[in-house]
């Protein structure tokens, strides 16, 4: 997805959030704030985005958004239980209506047989108690994996929570 397409998708998400009077927050690890960056590239985004969290280390995940150390130790940072706790923690900390969390292995190192480079976990949560998780395995270099993860996060937020609702 090109920068222009990411911008268009972000604008679409922003318009839907603004129409609902809703806000979104992000908790990002492997994307390093890229989702928040794309959101804030849109003029007027302060109407639907107040804050995001870049929680790259396990310590940051625990300190900033309340991911339990036991969860990190048992499952590892790139796991469904961790992204769920990231999304719920960000939702509470930001007092937002929607949260998107992302944790993955962008590469080129860090992969394993169980979690190869390109593995990314996502969680999406709402203040109404709804939520979904997704696991994707993207291909390409580090930049490509991170770009695909950013696009996937925005697309899924749009398709699962904002489109036709």
Curated annotation (Swiss-Prot):
Top-rank lineage group of the source organism: Bacteria
Enzyme class, broadest EC rank: hydrolase
Biological process per Gene Ontology, one example term: pyridine nucleotide biosynthetic process
EC number(s) on file: 3.5.1.42
rRNA processing in keyword set: no
InterPro entries associated with the record: CinA-like_C, CinA_C
Reactions mediated catalytically: beta-nicotinamide D-ribonucleotide + H2O = nicotinate beta-D-ribonucleotide + NH4(+)
NCBIfam families per UniProt: PncC_domain, PRK03661.1
Assembly information from the UniProt record: Homodimer.
Protein name from the UniProt record: Nicotinamide-nucleotide amidohydrolase PncC
